[in-house]
Amino acid sequence: MSQILAMLPDSLVAKWNVVVSVAALFNTVQSFLTPKLTKRVYSNTNEVNGLQGRTFGIWTLLSAIVRFYCAYHITNPDVYFLCQCTYYLACFHFLSEWLLFRTTNLGPGLLSPIVVSTVSIWFMAKEKASILGIAA
């Protein structure tokens, strides 16, 4: 495990993406095992079922894979862009479920993904020029 971490580029954005990816893996596993934590996000728990939970789990796993890959290939502009897109999509999803579809209420289950995605969007935009050598 330490050898894998040693191969990580010397970038706080890369390290952040690894942390977020590991957290997403936990979320993926729990999505397949039980809808309990997913129900903490959405206010209409009748809409949260096994199928929805597993679909959410696959979406979360895909995001984790992209972010983990980005952590190790942080200087590749295409990979960096795709990683940024995962955070924009997550932010859009949770904000639209809250503000547009009204399927969730403002609370810890919603705040966590909104804060993580927003901070990640800001952090990646802020560091983009220094990591890629291009304008944000």
UniProtKB/Swiss-Prot annotation:
GO MF annotation list: protein-macromolecule adaptor activity; protein-membrane adaptor activity
GO biological process: ergosterol biosynthetic process
Descriptive protein name: Ergosterol biosynthetic protein 28
Subunit structure of this chain's protein: Heterotetramer of erg25, erg26, erg27 and erg28. Erg28 acts as a scaffold to tether erg27 and other 4,4-demethylation-related enzymes, forming a demethylation enzyme complex, in the endoplasmic reticulum.
Keywords annotated in UniProt: Endoplasmic reticulum, Lipid biosynthesis, Lipid metabolism, Membrane, Steroid biosynthesis, Steroid metabolism, Sterol biosynthesis, Sterol metabolism, Transmembrane, Transmembrane helix
Pathway(s) where this gene product acts: Steroid metabolism; ergosterol biosynthesis
Keyword Lipid metabolism in record: yes
Gene Ontology annotations for the cellular component aspect, listed alphabetically: endoplasmic reticulum; endoplasmic reticulum membrane
Extra information: In Aspergillus, the biosynthesis pathway of the sterol precursors leading to the prevalent sterol ergosterol differs from yeast. The ringsystem of lanosterol in S.cerevisiae is firstly demethylised in three enzymatic steps leading to the intermediate zymosterol and secondly a methyl group is added to zymosterol by the sterol 24-C-methyltransferase to form fecosterol. In Aspergillus, lanosterol is firstly transmethylated by the sterol 24-C-methyltransferase leading to the intermediate eburicol and secondly demethylated in three steps to form fecosterol.
Transmembrane spans: 18-34, 56-72, 79-95, 109-125
